[in-house]
Amino acid sequence: MKIGILTQHFLLNYGGIIQNFALQQVLLKLGHDSLTFEHDTCYSRTRWFLRTIKHILRTRSFRNLPVYPIYKGRIGNKNFIKFVLRNIRSVPVKDFVPSLTAQYGIDAYVVGSDQVWRPAFNLGPRLGNMFLDFADDKVKKLSYAASFGCKKWEYTKEQEKACSKLARRFDAISVREASAVDLCKNHFGIDATLVLDPTLLLNKEDYEKVCNNIPKKENHIFVYSLVVGESVMNVASKVSEAKGLPIVVKEAGGKVKKEDTIEDWFAEFRDAEYVVTDSFHGMVFSIIFNKPFSIVMNPSGGNDRYISLLSQLGLTECIVDEKLTPSSAIIDWEQVCSRLNVLRESSLLFLKQNLR
């Protein structure tokens, strides 16, 4: 089948790129041809500002403000762009219209993974696009590991009504977090299937192939953080002191350095002695590479995506406590991998059954 993918694909976001890469690789292994549709328009600053003011007036709160979009002229370092061009088939799309299906010969659309159904990350018409509002009833529609970003319902009544109607047109819906199963049931009236993030459908060897040209690094403590702050570095310093190893830090988003590469990021997990992270995909790759790790939770919330996976794999001991004590859990990786393989098979089965 020819499959069109819609996802959150930020070129300054390691996780955003890698989950898209992984999904395309998995679909290829299943015998499908896939293409990621990239939003090519910039949501105007004026509309973003007005939307933000409207949100504050309506909720009387500064929580869950619309996220300012990444503009085309500001995205990515060149190495990230090179990785995307080499490894991810994508096409820029200015407007999502019904003619896209015939234009690219699409047999099915897959929405996911990552926070594709979080309103703050999908301004203007994008939220409707993420529910395939432009696709007619003839084309197959499903979501794979879609995420709302948190367990709290963030949709307005208007958004809920519109998206609920669109969601019912899907042939199958799968989500990334256990809480998202409840949100789909309670707000859309739909039964959703819990599946793994697409990065977990590939194994360690798949990622080692990507970074096999990166020389092996000396043992170190690897810190991967969305925003490197006092809490993360406090934990990392304690681990570093206990193990007598240096700390290597990589930061997401706007803090990505021009020399950083996706391949080197994989190699950091490959060669690290221990990982400290506050990132979902930082946690995921610690698991993939069987590295002991500590996950520092966000005090402002949105942690269900971490807890959901850790609970499934029996790894909740890796969560850092309020005293910022690093996890010293002795992980039974054989048991973790066994559980992961079961979840991987059921997740792949979802794709196999619904893409035929």
How would you describe each model-predicted region?
Residues 1-356:
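Active-site anion-handling motifs in enzyme catalytic cores
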